[in-house]
Amino acid sequence: MCIRDRPYLAEKICRSLASKIKKRFKKIDLILAPAMGGIVIGYEIGRILKKETIFCERVNGKFTLRRGFNIRKGMNVLIIEDVITTGKSSLECVKLIRDSKAKLLGFASLIDRSSKQTLKIKKRIISQLKISVPTYKKRKLPKNLISIPVTKPGSRFIK
């Protein structure tokens, strides 16, 4: 089951996450969501908090602001994703914020499945659910997992 195709569930879950966000961040000027997974979640939380919300999307493999979106100098920006695993997409968003001379407030996601081994983000992540998922180097994969095909969700390599 996926909440992105069930708006009635997305609203409920995002309302709960929005409540956590409101307690942690007092002055949010803008929500930035990376495409694809963050768009619906970012929009829904922006709607609930009544905050301007934009998204960035990949152009030639690099996150870019398009469609007339911009981050103004001095804005307090919160990055919202559906799932944070390594933090790579979030860190690409951070670059857009810094290049605009705006301020990064932090990160929020429905699911935080990052670990100390994979996380590249230094700020705290607010999430609805924290999941501990072991990660393995290819050569150290347990035998019981070797026969299971690897899948890689996300949009990083979509052309």
Q: What positions do the PLM features span?
A:
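Conserved acidic residues
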Residues: D29, M75, L105
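Short glycine-rich phosphate-binding loop at a beta-alpha junction
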Residues: K26-A35
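Acidic, divalent-metal-coordinating active-site segment for phosphoryl/phosphodiester hydrolysis
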Residues: V83-V94
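Active-site-facing substrate-recognition patch
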Residues: M1-K27, R156-K159
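Short, glycine/charge-rich flexible loops or terminal/linker lids adjacent to PRPP-binding catalytic cores
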Residues: M36, I41-L78, K88, K143
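Hydrophobic Val/Ile/Leu positions in short beta-strands of Rossmann-like dinucleotide-binding domains
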Residues: I3, I79-I80
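PRPP-dependent phosphoribosyltransferase catalytic core
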Residues: V94-K159
